């Protein structure tokens, strides 16, 4: 399926050693969806052109392979409230000020605007963790086929982002989703069960999961 029939990205296999595939262009919702459907994602700093990446290797998390440590097991027993798609703009704004990627603010105002539009279109989703009325953790990403493309997480109390990821994995497993794309390998995510695969394997898995219809709309849990 072509999400943006007016634009085609280069073959991901032609990216450089760091995974950089293309530079420039306008960050529109349709173009972002087209990128994800080809195993590509935007990542750039404010004031710079849009950079499009398809790294090799890739990091993914199979929903039923999430690892729960002893400390996290204790945290999961706390009376958090878990919600989906009730505070997308707050989650992405928190993520923008609590960046996971080398402590740099990479979630630009342009990205916030585009991903908010994708949320309104039913493609971008947020998972929220509440301690009473306070939003203490969460994550957001894109859903296509039976895959969830994680973008960023945040927490204001210890392990709240891990609670959000565990919450995401539970929901993805119940919906028979195939994998969560974690993009770049990190020791933190690997300690939670994420694994490294080749770009070739990732692209194959991606094409298989895109055979399923997109689960669009405002998500909810019963």
Curated annotation (Swiss-Prot):
GO terms for biological process: protein catabolic process. It is an enzyme of class 2 (transferase). It holds the Pfam family Leu_Phe_trans. It is found in: Cytoplasm. Its EC number is 2.3.2.6. Its main location: cytoplasm. PANTHER family: LEUCYL/PHENYLALANYL-TRNA--PROTEIN TRANSFERASE, LEUCYL_PHENYLALANYL-TRNA--PROTEIN TRANSFERASE. HAMAP family: Leu_Phe_trans. Functions in the N-end rule pathway of protein degradation where it conjugates Leu, Phe and, less efficiently, Met from aminoacyl-tRNAs to the N-termini of proteins containing an N-terminal arginine or lysine. This is Leucyl/phenylalanyl-tRNA--protein transferase. It comes from Legionella pneumophila subsp. pneumophila (strain Philadelphia 1 / ATCC 33152 / DSM 7513).
């Amino acid at each position: 399926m072509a999400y943006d029939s007016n634009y085609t990205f280069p073959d991901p296999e032609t990216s450089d050693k760091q995974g950089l595939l293309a530079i420039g262009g306008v960050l529109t919702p349709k173009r972002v969806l087209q990128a994800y459907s080809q195993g590509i994602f935007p990542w750039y700093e404010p004031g710079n052109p849009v950079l499009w990446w398809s790294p090799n290797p890739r990091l993914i998390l199979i929903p039923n392979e999430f690892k729960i440590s002893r400390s996290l097991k204790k945290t999961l027993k706390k009376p958090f409230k878990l919600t989906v798609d009730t505070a997308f703009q707050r989650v992405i704004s928190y993520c923008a000020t609590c960046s996971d990627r080398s402590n740099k603010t990479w979630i630009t105002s342009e990205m916030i605007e585009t991903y908010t539009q994708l949320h309104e279109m039913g493609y971008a989703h947020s998972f929220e963790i509440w301690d009473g009325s306070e939003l203490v953790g969460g994550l957001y990403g894109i859903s296509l086929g039976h895959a969830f493309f994680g973008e960023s997480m945040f927490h204001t109390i210890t392990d709240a982002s891990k609670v959000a990821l565990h919450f995401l994995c539970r929901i993805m497993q119940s919906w028979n989703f195939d994998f969560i794309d974690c993009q770049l390998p990190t020791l933190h995510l690997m300690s939670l069960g994420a694994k490294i695969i080749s770009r070739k394997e990732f692209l194959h898995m991606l094409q298989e999961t895109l055979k399923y219809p997109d689960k669009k709309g405002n998500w909810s849990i019963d």
